[in-house]
Amino acid sequence: MVEVIIAGSRDFNDYDYLEKSCHKIFYVLAKEYNILTNNIKKDISNMKIVSGTARGADSLGEQFAKKYNIKTKRFPADWNTHGKSAGYIRNKRMAEYAVTDESTGILIAFWDGKSKGTQHMINLARKNNLITFVVNYKTDEIEDDRMLFKVG
């Protein structure tokens, strides 16, 4: 199973940009992990989108999953129990969930270069050895640990 966390800044609201970015990233991943090919609909049975359920990138990720009939796993933050720490606790749970002996974990983070919550998710993903893609929608660049490329 491939667990793909789609997360990011709450002010990110460009679905078309998210979709285009995900297609580009999945094309790169297809060669290495055989999860998808050029046509995203070709093989999605071994993939799940993981969402923190926040507005912005998380919600757009769920919209993407619905459009392509991809299974989802939701991790809403428990603000009533954990207060201001809820988002950080939720991020940790998602990162740990995405990587098991039976799954490959991937993070696609849509970041403005400022959001502390998104930076926290990126740091957790790297700490937990998830394949990490950071889409800086302000500079139109996608970065992973091996390369830097443009969305457009």
Segments predicted by a language model, with ranges:
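Acidic/glycine-enriched connector segments
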Residues: 3, 12-152
